[in-house]
Every structure is written in C-alpha cells, then in structure tokens.
Amino acid sequence: MIYEKISRERVNGFLHAVGRTIQNGNNEEILLTGWGLGNWLNPEGYMWKSGEVSFSRGREAEKSIRELAGEEYAQKFWKQFRANYITKKDIEKMAEFGYNSVRIPINWRLFMEETPGEIIWKDEGFTLLDHCIQWCKECKLYAWIDLHAAPGGQTGSNIDDSEDDLPRLFMNDDYYTKGLALWRKLANRYKDEWIVGGYDLLNEPIMPNDG
C-alpha cells in the first residue's frame, strides 16, 4: 500500500488536497518523497568548503570571487556553475532511485534586477527553472518551487541571502512589491504545468522584532 502511494506511476496530473491527503489528477493518494536542489539556484555558505573566505551567503560568495579573480571571471564562473551543478542526469538519477518529487530553492536575484523602485526581469533564472521543470516532466518527478531567498530576505539570516541579517521583505515596500511581482510572474508562467506540484511561497519566514 505504501509502495503504491510513493510510486512514480502516481506522478500524473495536477496535485490537489483532499482532507489531510494529497491526490494526483486521477484522485489517487500520493506520498511525496524527494530531494532538494540546495546550493544550485541559491548558493548557501554551509554547502561550500571556502576556508577562511566568506561564503556565508550567495551575495558574499559572489563578492569574494569577484575580488579574487575579477568581474569577467566571476561572471563566467557562475554561468558554468549553474550549467553543471545540476543537470538532467541528476534528475534522471533521482527518478532511478525511486523518488517522485524535487524541491527547487531559488534566489530572487536570478530573476530580477536589484534596481530600487523598478521591476526589471532577468532571463537567466527563468531559463534554468524552465529546463529543470522540463527534466522533471520527462522523468516523472513533481517539481516544487521554493522561494528560498526573497527580495530583501524573509528570514534574516544567511540562508535567505539577506544583506544585513534582517527580514527586509517585511520592512521595505520596494522589496515587498518585488516579492509580489515575482510570485505573480512565476504563477502565471507555470499555471498550466501540471508537473509543478506546488510552491513554497517563503522558506522559513520570520517577522522583524520591532521590540
């Protein structure tokens, strides 16, 4: 019974909730098992062995590499990193192992410029996410899009790529507006993709302590 519920044969159609269960497009219960693609579209310091160099969060890793090797090299490095850190072969291997879902943590800065007061889209993040979702469809694993690093940060720690360990998403109107715009864009882009099982709107959000 359990084996049937975790089988990739149940990766079929839009997921929906029925009481305390999750069901597929055939109204069959499915138990989700899977991997998280941490450090790919949102670099996290603890996943790097950077020694004394500060890689505590994505923006600091980017700064360290720029200072060490220059802007041109840094741009090439991150492009190659994202092209190779996760590939279709990784998704195929997860399917081979019998899992039925993949969580994809993302950083807003791959999708939007940081320009204050403006909404300027970037192609890189959407292209990478499109590819991963297509791999998931081909390999029959539900994809879960996780906004791990929201505009300004939603947790106030290194995991959300915040600038100063404050959840400024909740403290700054511009960041809040960017966050809403990003989710509208993502929802509209993938609304017809049944393989997108769901969305983690904000990973580990915490309101600022005003006291």
Where are these regions (language model features)?
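Generic recognition of long tandem-repeat/solenoid scaffolds
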Residues: 18-24
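Secreted/periplasmic carbohydrate-active enzymes, especially glycoside hydrolases
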Residues: 1-16
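Active-site mouth of glycoside hydrolases
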Residues: 6, 10, 21, 29-32, ...
